[in-house]
């Protein structure tokens, strides 16, 4: 398949803001591939359209930043001065490269046109290049692609290299296109994506005529991690009890979500971003291997513990463990980890459609019960033990007063609050569900993404000291909700400045526009209505709690979350 044929449809998708039209254009692309291409082409375009070369579950990136792309563009005959001026003018490095390359006589005049397969395989190879001369090799490969491309192709190649296509396409739109073209149930194809996190594989299977609802490759599988199910906010414990009837309460741990996969004696542990962190936590792997279980996927919260106090250590200690690549044993001696398991998603077969109460029974056979109302003495002892693997502390009751006691006890041992779950509910990967709620003692902190950074003043003049922060809507569009600078240490500012310089896509002088990759957890005095921002809300006195390197843009809070918190707080006043 010629890359230019793909680009022509991408251009149509980019020029419309209407979701249904974008869906129709992708349907047109599927039809073109059906009649002119190969099944593999639909896999490739499904991923490329959303700025990916790898499936989401693989947690791999091309790893090229704007600075390296600019170096490659310079070798094609475009000056850095002209390029930066055009980027500033257009706000888009892809359009800047397209505009400037239109004025340059390309070597590709007598060469073969680029194919989709060439682009796809070349970009996959880029991610594998390592070593001392890796930057030069990458620059040369990117340069060759740009020289061989026509102006329109160069726009999309440049964006794809940065894994940001900027055409307003997302997974739900592609799934809707699959549903329309192949006449498959939309809910069914959404569920399949939830357990595979591989949009390309689904496309390839569909165009090959597979019965996707019964295809074993599209079922939940060990060593293919899934996105976690997410909880809703609730105004009160009483409201959540009404929603969940006889709920299961669990401690909301101050830790990091993990998935544990085990089969044939092999153990992999994944973070909530689906990163494989197995090598960073060898003591947990060793403990899991001691348990006589196989072909299983478990979910829990990894907590860094201070065994002298029985309370969790700061969240940053967990990130230190997860990021560590060297001297792991030394760090493990200082930072003790444990996992509180609260779900089993696979045990010899997929269990996500099984009610929580039945999944919990399986979990308790493996790790024992921890019923707060009847086993508190045992629980209190285990908190101070060297034991690493637990089932989560729980309470089954519809008594709000007892639930509040459990809530206060969970806070007293250093954790964040409680979860409230419907015991009859299935597990819905990657969705914020109405069968699971969270209760915390204060305003819910927000996870936001940084979209701009501004040079600081005074002591902060050497760093980016102020950050524009945004949440997302249902269409994954970003909405600014404020600016934050307080709460950041000098070490934080230095680290953030390094990252900003790697991901800035437009330089406005004192301010830069960024790829949305930095996630911050922020607290605030209140959410207030505001005409300053398009979304109509703003954070009053936001303050950074921590840099959430364990989270991506997929994990940030939504506009609906902001509205819900605003309403909850307004009703409390």
Swiss-Prot record:
Gene Ontology terms describing biological process: cell division; DNA biosynthetic process; DNA recombination; DNA repair; lagging strand elongation
EC category name: ligase
Protein EC: 6.5.1.1
Gene3D superfamilies xrefs: DNA ligase, ATP-dependent, N-terminal domain, DNA ligase/mRNA capping enzyme, Nucleic acid-binding proteins
Reactions mediated catalytically: ATP + (deoxyribonucleotide)n-3'-hydroxyl + 5'-phospho-(deoxyribonucleotide)m = (deoxyribonucleotide)n+m + AMP + diphosphate
Residues the record lists as binding ATP: 250, 257, 272, 301, 342, 432, 438
Keywords on record: ATP-binding, Cell cycle, Cell division, DNA damage, DNA recombination, DNA repair, DNA replication, Ligase, Magnesium, Metal-binding, Nucleotide-binding
GO MF terms, alphabetically ordered: ATP binding; DNA binding; DNA ligase (ATP) activity; metal ion binding
Superkingdom assignment: Archaea
Active-site residues annotated for this sequence: 252
Cofactor: Mg(2+)
Family: Belongs to the ATP-dependent DNA ligase family.
Function: DNA ligase that seals nicks in double-stranded DNA during DNA replication, DNA recombination and DNA repair.
NCBIfam families listed in its UniProt record: dnl1
Protein name from the UniProt record: DNA ligase
């Amino acid at each position: 398949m010629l890359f230019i044929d793909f680009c022509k449809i991408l251009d149509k998708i980019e020029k419309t803001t209407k979701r249904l039209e974008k869906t129709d254009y992708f349907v047109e692309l599927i039809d073109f591939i059906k009649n002119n291409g190969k099944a593999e082409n639909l896999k490739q375009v499904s991923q490329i359209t959303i700025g990916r070369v790898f499936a989401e579950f693989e947690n791999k990136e091309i790893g090229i930043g704007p600075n390296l792309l600019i170096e490659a563009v310079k070798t094609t005959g475009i000056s850095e001065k002209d390029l930066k001026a055009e980027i500033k003018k257009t706000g888009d490095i892809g359009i800047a490269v397209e505009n400037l390359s239109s004025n340059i006589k390309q070597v590709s005049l007598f060469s073969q046109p680029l194919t989709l397969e060439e682009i796809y395989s070349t970009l996959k190879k880029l991610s594998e290049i390592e070593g001392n001369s890796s930057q030069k090799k990458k620059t040369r490969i990117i340069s060759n692609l740009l020289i061989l491309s026509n102006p329109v192709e160069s726009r999309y190649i440049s964006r794809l290299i940065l894994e940001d296509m900027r055409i307003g396409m997302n997974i739900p739109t592609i799934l809707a296109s699959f549903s329309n073209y192949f006449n498959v149930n939309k809910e069914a194809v959404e569920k399949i994506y939830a357990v595979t996190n591989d949009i390309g594989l689904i496309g390839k299977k569909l165009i090959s005529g597979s019965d996707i609802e019964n295809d074993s490759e599209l079922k939940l599988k060990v060593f293919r991690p899934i996105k976690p199910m997410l909880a809703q906010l609730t105004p009160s414990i009483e409201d959540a009890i009404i929603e969940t009837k006889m709920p299961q309460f669990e401690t909301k741990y101050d830790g990091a979500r993990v998935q544990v996969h085990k089969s044939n004696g092999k153990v992999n542990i994944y973070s909530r971003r689906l990163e494989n962190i197995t090598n960073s936590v060898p003591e947990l792997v060793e403990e899991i291997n001691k348990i006589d279980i196989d072909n299983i996927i478990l979910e829990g919260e990894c907590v860094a513990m201070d065994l002298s106090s029985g309370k969790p250590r700061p969240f940053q200690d967990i990130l230190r463990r997860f990021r560590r690549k060297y001297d792991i044993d030394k760090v493990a001696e200082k930072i003790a980890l444990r996992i509180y398991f609260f779900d089993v998603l696979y045990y010899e077969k997929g269990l996500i459609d099984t009610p929580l109460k039945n999944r919990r029974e399986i979990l308790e056979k493996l790790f024992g019960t921890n019923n707060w109302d009847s086993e508190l003495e045992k629980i209190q002892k285990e908190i101070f033990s060297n034991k690493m693997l637990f089932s989560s502390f729980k309470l089954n009751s519809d008594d709000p007063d007892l639930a509040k006691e459990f809530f206060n006890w969970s806070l007293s041992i250093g954790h964040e609050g409680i979860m409230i779950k419907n015991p009859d509910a299935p597990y819905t990967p990657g969705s914020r569900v109405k069968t699971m709620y969270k209760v915390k003692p204060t305003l819910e902190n927000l996870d936001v993404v940084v979209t701009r950074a501004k040079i600081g003043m005074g002591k902060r003049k050497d760093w980016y000291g102020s950050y524009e922060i945004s949440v997302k809507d249902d269409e994954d569009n970003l909405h600014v909700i404020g600016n934050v600078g307080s709460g950041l240490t000098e070490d934080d500012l230095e680290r953030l400045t390094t990252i900003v310089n790697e991901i800035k896509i437009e330089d406005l002088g004192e301010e830069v526009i960024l790829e949305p990759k930095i996630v911050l957890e922020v607290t605030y005095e209140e959410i207030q209505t505001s005409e300053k921002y398009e979304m109509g809300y703003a954070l009053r006195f936001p303050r950074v709690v921590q840099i959430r390197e364990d989270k991506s843009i997929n994990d940030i809070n939504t506009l609906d979350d902001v509205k819900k918190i605003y309403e909850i707080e307004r009703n409390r006043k």
